[in-house]
């Protein structure tokens, strides 16, 4: 099942974008200052923005820059151990008996949103949470 999560993340990564992007020097400089240890990165461009795709410490990243090298959005894909403790505690209390399957964290200038997939023996539960632990069930699916 974890493979499904990774495949879904990879598919989303490549949707509606083009390859062979040449980021501006400002973008490359900003990226290298922030992510000094990253050696393998692929770039995509769309809508006058550049997207860096890479992995670091078992977390898959998508970081979007404007042409001036400013980060406009980041998306990270990871597992339960990387969720903030506060969010983990809220999940455990509200969704007792369910296990975190995967997390998509979306960060913009004004917001951090966690899209969390939970599972138990019979269902998949998609939960959305903000940084304050305000969460709700987006959808619930029965396993086949």
Task: Describe every region a protein language model picked out.
Residues 85-134:
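Surface-exposed, polar helix/loop patches in the mature regions of secreted/periplasmic/lumenal proteins
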Residues 78-81, 142-144:
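A short acidic/small-residue loop/turn micro-motif
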Residues 41-43, 74, 101-103:
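Generic beta-strand hydrophobic packing signal
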Residues 52-77, 125-139:
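Amphipathic N-proximal alpha-helical interface segments
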Residues 39-62, 106-126:
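Exposed beta-strand-loop-beta-strand "reactive/processing" segments of non-cytosolic proteins
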């Amino acid at each position: 099942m974890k493979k499904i999560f990774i495949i879904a993340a990879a598919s989303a990564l490549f949707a509606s974008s083009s390859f062979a992007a040449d980021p501006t020097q400002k973008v490359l400089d900003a990226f290298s200052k922030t992510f000094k240890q990253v050696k393998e990165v692929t770039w995509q461009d769309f809508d006058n923005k550049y997207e860096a795709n890479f992995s670091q410490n078992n977390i898959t990243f998508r970081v979007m820059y404007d042409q001036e090298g400013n980060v406009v959005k980041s998306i990270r894909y990871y597992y339960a151990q990387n969720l903030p403790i506060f969010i983990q505690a809220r999940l455990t209390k509200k969704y007792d008996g369910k296990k975190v399957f995967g997390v998509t964290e979306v960060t913009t200038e004004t917001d951090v949103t966690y899209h969390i997939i939970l599972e138990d023996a019979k269902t998949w539960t998609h939960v959305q949470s903000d940084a304050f632990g305000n969460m709700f069930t987006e959808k619930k699916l029965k396993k086949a």
